[in-house]
């Protein structure tokens, strides 16, 4: 799919989260069952087609069933979206981003310790 994937609207991201969570090929009825918000089968079909066109999914028809698999990993998408948010909202500054999380109450002492340990591991060359 290339090095850059596109940002997904919330409805398409919800579908991709179900597909990524399946850890293999998944059918439309399985996707519908996995969605938190109700969606009609025809609306889901439109979203799936769009995700195929954007290069996020592949579809293989087996008998009468379409099986969908991701073409981009959840990790790759998360990395791209994280970098995009960091660049757009915090001018690429991780310090500003962490400060916003802390000031907004999204980071507690345990999470700060986890982040500190992770950064120490990165500095030590361990991943």
Per-region residue spans from a language model:
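Amphipathic alpha-helical dimerization/coiled-coil segments
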Residues: 80-125
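Short alpha-helical segments that sit at the start of domains
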Residues: 1-16, 125
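Short, cationic-aromatic polyanion-contact patches
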Residues: 6-11, 62-81
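Glycine-centered, phosphate/nucleic-acid-interacting loop/turn motifs that mediate DNA/RNA or nucleotide
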Residues: 55
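Short acidic, hydrophobic short linear motifs in intrinsically disordered regions
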Residues: 25-35
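Short amphipathic alpha-helical elements of helix-turn-helix/winged-helix folds
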Residues: 14, 18-22, 34
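Short capping segments at the starts of secondary-structure elements
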Residues: 8, 21-27
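Short, hydrophobic-biased segments on the C-terminal half of alpha helices
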Residues: 45-49
């Amino acid at each position: 799919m290339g090095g850059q994937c596109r940002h997904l609207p919330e409805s398409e991201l919800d579908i991709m989260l179900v597909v990524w969570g399946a850890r293999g090929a998944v059918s439309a009825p399985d996707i519908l069952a996995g969605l938190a918000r109700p969606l009609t089968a025809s609306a889901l079909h439109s979203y799936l087609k769009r995700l195929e066109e954007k290069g996020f999914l592949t579809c293989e028809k087996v008998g009468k069933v379409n099986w969908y698999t991701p073409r981009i990993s959840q990790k790759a998408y998360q990395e791209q979206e994280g970098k995009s948010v960091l660049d757009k909202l915090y001018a690429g500054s991780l310090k500003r981003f962490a400060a916003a999380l802390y000031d907004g109450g999204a980071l507690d002492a345990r999470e700060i310790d986890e982040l500190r340990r992770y950064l120490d591991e990165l500095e030590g060359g361990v991943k």
